[in-house]
């Protein structure tokens, strides 16, 4: 693949890609085959897998109509390209919606390393650098086909992303076969199923095939033989070194299938920091030592030039190193265990990714600058051609004008020729259409005028009716008002007081007050009864007022008496509380005095006593491990007796 990339990018690859140049095509394919197996295994458990920098394998649920208003829920695997990669290169992909109840796990490099002979850093570097090559190929608008073993093929052509799954993989995801038929029959997904893997591998030469990457740097590497013992037979294994000057490089031994099964049994959550002790196995006759199995990081691997370490001493009696507070077992475990600091490693990777992105951005900027420069040169050449053409045309026009300076563009005819018959027919048609338009316009104006006159007459009739109705209403209201006034005058005449008596001169009888006696008597009786009622009401009110005053006085007296009793009770309670407080204080003082005397006696006795009196001071003689809380001379034995423990001096098996 490096042969198709520019020389500047080849130099950059040699500087910033340390892992891929040390691997062959078969090893890269093996690593990605293990990655595909991990993805397929997680999809079989209905879990999605996220490959950082590439995309996510997950599931999508759809309802397919099978007829008669019946639907079947189908769950099919899908691949969603990473949004960052899509935005960077302007890729196009069909939008797929995945449900939120499907868990998505990241790519676990530790689990992949347990399945093959490569360590975690090698696998991670191979995956990331392969994705960098993929991003570079997409940026230069090349056709890319990325094969996932056992899953399908990811193709990118003309900035369009398409994931095609193998038919066997879809059948393993859905044993009923409905999913394969549904995808093959639908217009949008009919090209998402590969019926034959061999036929699809015959791809054109213009397409970049991933993950097989060719490197020229791997040709000069010398293989190193690592001999491992497995079942009593020595089998050589050739492994290529990264660099001869690299101190952290080392030989890797392919473990037996049994050991692979033991490694696979480890759960992913417990393999965050793996550092196994070197295991030495001696055969019964030859006494040969096998190479160590080490799953830690490359910084913790041994070189081939180092000799195998001898087995540690069986016991350590004194064990009095400076600051040593651990037993023999914990000390050996701490010396052989190397912690993996993921924070520093993560920061280092982030810095490396940023540096790669900066260099990649510089390359893209240079390419854009070169493209703009080429476009500018092409535009300049085109402008020069246009200017030369315009100059030639202007020169030709100028020469033509100079040759015929008295050329006129207008002409005068003495007699206008007659129009042909075809134009006469057209003129007749035009005149007929104009006459029709005039007639229709005239009819329209007449109809509008008639409508206006009709509306005016209707408005006049309506106005006349409204005026007549208003006149009738006015007359009706006037008649009602007249009748009202008449009834009022009749009532006044009816209720008119009697007239004054006629004047009689020299009359001996009284004129006024003849019938006033009876009225005065009735009036006086009414006044007397009213006064009597008022006197009774005043007396009852006064009596009620006096009774209320007496009741209030009695209530106030009772309240004062109750307040006095409560005050006396409060004073008595306060006196009791003060007395109790004084008594408690006196008792506390006596108790404190007795305790002080006792403490003084104990201090004097402690001063007279010898050292190592307390239990904690006595425990200093018995050193304990700070991790397992056993004695420091512990070499791994247990305080529990086995079932076949033989007691000395006895013939019993306990």
Swiss-Prot record:
Keywords: Coiled coil, Cytoplasm, Cytoskeleton, Phosphoprotein. Pfam families: HU-CCDC81_euk_1 (PF14908), HU-CCDC81_euk_2 (PF18289). The modification Phosphoserine is found at residues 206, 273, 275, 296, 419. Residues 212-222, 232-251 have a biased composition (Basic and acidic residues). Residues 431-562 form a coiled coil. GO terms for cellular component: centrosome; ciliary basal body; cytoplasm; plasma membrane. It is found in: Cytoplasm, Cytoskeleton, Microtubule organizing center, Centrosome. Residues 196-270, 293-318 are annotated as: Disordered. Residues 293-302 have a biased composition (Polar residues). This is Coiled-coil domain-containing protein 81. It comes from Mus musculus (Mouse).
């Amino acid at each position: 693949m490096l042969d198709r990339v520019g020389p500047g990018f080849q130099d950059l690859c040699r500087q910033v890609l340390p892992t891929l140049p040390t691997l062959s095509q078969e090893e890269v394919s093996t690593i990605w085959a293990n990655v595909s197996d991990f993805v397929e295994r997680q999809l079989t458990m209905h879990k999605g897998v996220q490959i950082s920098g590439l995309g996510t394998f997950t599931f999508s649920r759809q309802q397919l109509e099978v007829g008669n208003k019946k639907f079947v829920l189908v769950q099919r695997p899908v691949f969603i390209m990473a949004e960052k990669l899509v935005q960077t290169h302007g890729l196009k992909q069909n939008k797929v919606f995945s449900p939120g109840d499907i868990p998505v796990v990241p790519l676990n490099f530790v689990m992949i390393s347990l399945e093959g002979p490569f360590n975690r850093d090698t696998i991670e570097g191979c995956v990331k650098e392969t994705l960098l090559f993929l991003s570079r190929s997409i940026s230069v608008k090349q056709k890319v086909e990325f094969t996932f073993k056992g899953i399908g093929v990811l193709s990118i052509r003309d900035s369009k992303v398409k994931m095609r799954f193998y038919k066997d993989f879809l059948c393993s995801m859905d044993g009923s076969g409905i999913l394969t038929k549904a995808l093959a029959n639908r217009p949008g997904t009919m090209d998402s199923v590969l019926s034959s893997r061999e036929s699809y591998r015959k791809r054109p030469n213009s397409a970049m095939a991933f993950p097989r990457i060719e490197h020229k740097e791997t040709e000069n590497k010398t293989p190193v033989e690592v001999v491992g013992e497995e079942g009593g037979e020595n089998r050589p294994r050739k492994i290529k070194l990264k660099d001869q000057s690299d101190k952290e490089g080392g030989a890797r031994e392919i473990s037996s299938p049994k050991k692979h099964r033991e490694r696979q049994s480890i759960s992913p959550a417990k393999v965050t920091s793996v550092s196994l002790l070197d295991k030495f196995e001696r055969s019964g006759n030859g006494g040969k030592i096998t190479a160590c199995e080490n799953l830690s990081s490359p910084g913790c691997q041994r070189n081939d030039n180092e000799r195998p370490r001898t087995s540690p001493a069986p016991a350590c009696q004194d064990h009095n190193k400076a600051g040593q507070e651990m037993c023999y077992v914990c000390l050996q475990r701490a010396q052989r265990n190397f912690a993996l600091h993921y924070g520093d490693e993560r920061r280092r990777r982030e810095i490396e990714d940023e540096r790669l992105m900066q260099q990649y951005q510089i390359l893209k900027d240079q390419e854009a600058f070169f493209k703009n420069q080429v476009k500018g040169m092409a535009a300049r050449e085109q402008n020069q051609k246009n200017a030369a053409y315009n100059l030639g045309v202007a020169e030709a026009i100028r020469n033509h004008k100079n040759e015929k300076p008295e050329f006129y563009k207008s002409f005068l005819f003495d007699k206008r020729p007659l129009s042909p018959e075809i134009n006469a027919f057209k003129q007749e048609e035009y005149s007929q259409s104009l006459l029709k338009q005039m007639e229709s316009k005239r009819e329209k104006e007449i109809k509008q005028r008639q409508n206006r006159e009709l509306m005016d007459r209707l408005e006049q009739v309506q106005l006349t009716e409204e005026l007549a109705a208003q006149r009738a209403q006015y007359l009706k209201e006037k008649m009602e008002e007249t009748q009202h006034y008449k009834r009022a005058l009749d009532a006044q005449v009816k209720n008119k007081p009697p007239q004054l008596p006629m004047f009689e001169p020299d009359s001996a009888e009284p004129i006024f007050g003849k019938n006033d006696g009876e009225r005065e008597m009735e009036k006086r009786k009414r006044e007397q009864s009213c006064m009597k009622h008022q006197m009774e009401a005043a007396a009852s009110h006064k009596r009620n007022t006096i009774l209320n005053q007496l009741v209030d006085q009695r209530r106030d007296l009772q309240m004062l008496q109750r307040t006095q009793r409560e005050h006396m009770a409060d004073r008595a309670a306060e006196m009791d509380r003060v007395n109790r407080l004084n008594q408690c204080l006196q008792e506390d003082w006596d108790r404190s005095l007795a305790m002080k005397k006792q403490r003084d006696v104990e201090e004097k006795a402690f001063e007279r006593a010898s050292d190592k009196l307390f239990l904690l001071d006595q425990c200093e003689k018995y050193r304990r491990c700070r991790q397992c809380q056993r004695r420091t001379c512990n070499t791994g034995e247990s305080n529990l007796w086995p079932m076949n423990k033989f007691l000395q001096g006895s013939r019993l098996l306990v």
